[in-house]
Amino acid sequence: GYFYWMLIRSFGPVPILPDEGVDYTKDYDEIAQPRNTYDECADYISNELVKAAAQLPDDRGLQEVARPTRGAALALRARVLLYAASPLYNGKAPSEVLTAMVDKEGRQLLSSTYDEVKWARAAAAAKDVMELGKYNLYVVYAKENGDIAEPATITPPDDNGTFHSNPWPKGWQNIDPFLSYRSLFDGTAIAYGNDELIYTRGSNQGNEGIDIMVIHQLPRSQGGGYNYHGITQKQCDAYYMKDGADCPGMNSMYQGREGYTDPSRYDVEARPSGVITQNELAEYPELGSMGTGVSKQYAAREPRFYASVGYNGSIWHMLNANTDKGEKTNVQIFYYRDKPDGYKAGAYWLHTGIGIKKFVNPHDRADSEKTYDVSRVQAKTAPDIRYAEV
């Protein structure tokens, strides 16, 4: 079931092979079979995962941390059914997609009819995981003091309800949303004993792990990384403001384009202009003490934004720097054309102009003189399925 899920994620609907397999010694024409529909694939995967859940253990030991459990099978099932209920696969795909997604006989592989029942099945599958009673969200509790890399807790905004004033788990009054989220990905939270982590595959592929990905994310000029991986403006716009509102100007670059004629898909309000000055810095504690020069479109955003996005002017801590060799810590990095990590920086420039800090630990630092040297990169756990997603 898991590998069929990986296939349909990458290629869309695929042929479902018979349980007894096929005789690969026969001619292709004898064993070839058409693709199944997306719904058929999702139903098959769902059924296989139910069978697997009945046979898998409830818990994983220290030596089996990357092995699946009953909860992992049920959580993956919930994800598969959620995707099947989503607009693209539930009657809301654009006509050009429906037309293109057919088999060689012309059979439509994506449903053109909306079915509310799909959402009910996905919700019921998620409830199956929740009712196991084994998982909780990972939190870091609030602290009054800190430094630039491990900042003191910024009080979350008033939600006009009771969530902001109640302690965890009924509210966020005594937790740090920023560190709670960042720690899940940057290696602070280890796999074993993390009640939010439902499934991780581990890492056994040499130079294809998260540590190598981090080296590709780190800035070149000061971090020794490759400065390659970036996100798009659309991904950046997906993060909310700290009060939960959409960011001003969200997706405005698509206004008038095909598929964006619905005004609800973009925000017509202008993006904030100008940059943060020293006199204004105290108004934006989320930027830290080195936030001058940052575009105001990156200010007052939600905690996940600052744990994930390497925006222009963000601080890369790199606490494992070798100061005896002149390496620096807590460096403000800009990706403008005339900057060391910008377009003119030879081969090592960030193509989108917006970097990625997710999975980057404050201590992580690379060495530009050593290819893929991860000795100063914190080991990470791949959070393939988290309880927060359920």
Language-model regions: role of each:
Residues 139-389:
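Elongated scaffold/linker segments in the mid-to-C-terminal portions of large proteins
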